[in-house]
Amino acid sequence: MQSVLSLSFSQASLPLANRTLCSSNAAPSTPRNLRFCGLRREAFCFSPSKQLTSCRFHIQSRRIEVSAAASSSAGNGAPSKSFDYDLIIIGAGVGGHGAALHAVEKGLKTAIIEGDVVGGTCVNRGCVPSKALLAVSGRMRELQNEHHMKAFGLQVSAAGYDRQGVADHASNLATKIRNNLTNSMKALGVDILTGFGAVLGPQKVKYGDNIITGKDIIIATGSVPFVPKGIEVDGKTVITSDHALKLESVPDWIAIVGSGYIGLEFSDVYTALGSEVTFIEALDQLMPGFDPEISKLAQRVLINTRKIDYHTGVFASKITPAKDGKPVLIELIDAKTKEPKDTLEVDAALIATGRAPFTNGLGLENINVTTQRGFIPVDERMRVIDGNGKLVPHLYCIGDANGKLMLAHAASAQGISVVEQVTGRDHVLNHLSIPAACFTHPEISMVGLTEPQAREKAEKEGFKVSIAKTSFKANTKALAENEGEGLAKMIYRPDNGEILGVHIFGLHAADLIHEASNAIALGTRIQDIKLAVHAHPTLSEVVDELFKAAKVDSPASVTAQSVKVTV
């Protein structure tokens, strides 16, 4: 990529109501401890060193009570004295939406300000429409694979597509999800305020010609496509992901600048629809953000077998849109020496060099906050730090705007964590427990550290690292689907069973990663989780076999406990 920034165009609901779960002999260790995406277990009255003797969960009407009175979620609450709102959120993307809903559930009078459309990048120009396009590309790819169909005994005539119909599928899905988000906030009484929000001063926000006050403020303004200097975007032949998701054309030959999540996903879409793709990558290898072993396998499957070529170790120093019958012109230079390398003439170019924070015009100068490469500096609790290194009281920043982890679900988790804090619970989010996924066919997913990162950490801290692997070729369900190409890899500590990272390439990898991410979030050790039972035959057995393949010195720390369930 030409930028270090990258983004993947990427909450569990409660179970059935009126069920009571009781346990009088809970184990003293962690497997049953509940924690949201790496939030501290202390928030749920659990202690890793004390036995749970009388913890009762009563689930009714989508409400949880854990040794405390639950806050009312029936409508927006009354604000604190002297403030218009308890919480003001600037930005109604996925992060702002998650924070708003959680705030109302906690009884906070909440307002959310949006100057564009509800849903932000993820819903309107990212995760949601891209998944619609990828759903199409996946089906096209399968129908076009005569060998794959023949293995099932199926005969399929030549597959085709209607470009506008595909584009409409993506647009309609974005509209549906956007309406769902809007309606969910309205139903809970969140005040949705229209206008561009800016901080006027401590606990004071302006939107349009209006000024409101809030006890606490969250900035959740997200990001925009990053376009390097020298690249002219016309929205037709030189485009960003914002334009590509509209699928206004399917060029015969398109260059994709950057081979991260965004570039890989669009290469999957374009090649399935008939385009030839050329990757332009600044680093010496494709897919630099992934674990090297996974990258190597993914390149063999996702790139080498398709109509894709690539240039690595080069910058696109200048890109000129097509005009007057001339093609798109791309001038390449060596990434290290900056010497001219090559010139490409293509039908279109997609700039997939990552995302840049959208933080201009937020009034940060009014509170002495200086951005760092556009990102708003925050501490581990998402509290904003001013130019003097001091915390700005009652001001938080979540999501892409703070740059900690540019993923939609990370923004939502950060927003929920902040709401927990402003309602009296100290929460620190473990970002290493947050998974990421690339929705190619097959998919790539990961959580925690890559092998090089883990070995660097081990060398500094003085412990050993081991690797466990398992292949999809040994999984019955994958073979039944004729999708045996895949690998799961775990990096761990053999001395204590700590999971440092898990990386998966294969069928439904994006779904399979969550068992590992939850284990990291909960602090569950391999010697405990390897005793879990998985249904057969399922893809989840890939992860099961991965845990079982690990060799850990420490014995399991738990024994089976009987749990009485009353329905």
UniProtKB/Swiss-Prot annotation:
Deletion phenotype: Arsenate hypersensitivity.
Catalyzed reaction equations: N(6)-[(R)-dihydrolipoyl]-L-lysyl-[protein] + NAD(+) = N(6)-[(R)-lipoyl]-L-lysyl-[protein] + NADH + H(+)
Active-site residues, record numbering mapped to chain: 536 (proton acceptor)
Gene3D superfamilies, sorted: 3.30.390.30, FAD/NAD(P)-binding domain
Chloroplast as UniProt keyword: yes
The protein, known as: Dihydrolipoyl dehydrogenase 2, chloroplastic
Primary location: plastid
UniProt cross-references to PANTHER family, sorted A to Z: DIHYDROLIPOYL DEHYDROGENASE 2, CHLOROPLASTIC (PTHR22912:SF207), DISULFIDE OXIDOREDUCTASE (PTHR22912)
Free-text tissue specificity from the UniProt record: Expressed mainly in flower buds and immature siliques, and to a lesser extent in flowers.
UniProt cofactor note: Binds 1 FAD per subunit.
Residue range of the transit peptide in the UniProt record, numbered on this chain: 1-67
Other comments on record: The active site is a redox-active disulfide bond.
Localization annotation: Plastid, Chloroplast stroma
Subunit structure: Homodimer. Part of the plastidial pyruvate dehydrogenase complex (PDC) containing multiple copies of three enzymatic components: pyruvate dehydrogenase (E1), dihydrolipoamide acetyltransferase (E2) and lipoamide dehydrogenase (E3).
Pfam family, one: Pyr_redox_dim
Binding-site residues, NAD(+): 258-265, 281, 354
Family: Belongs to the class-I pyridine nucleotide-disulfide oxidoreductase family.
Entry GO terms, CC: chloroplast; chloroplast envelope; chloroplast stroma; cytosol
GO molecular function: dihydrolipoyl dehydrogenase (NADH) activity
Binding site for FAD: 114-122, 131, 197, 221-223, 400, 406-409
Cofactor(s) listed: FAD
EC number(s) on file: 1.8.1.4
Residue pairs linked by disulfide bridges in the UniProt entry: 122-127
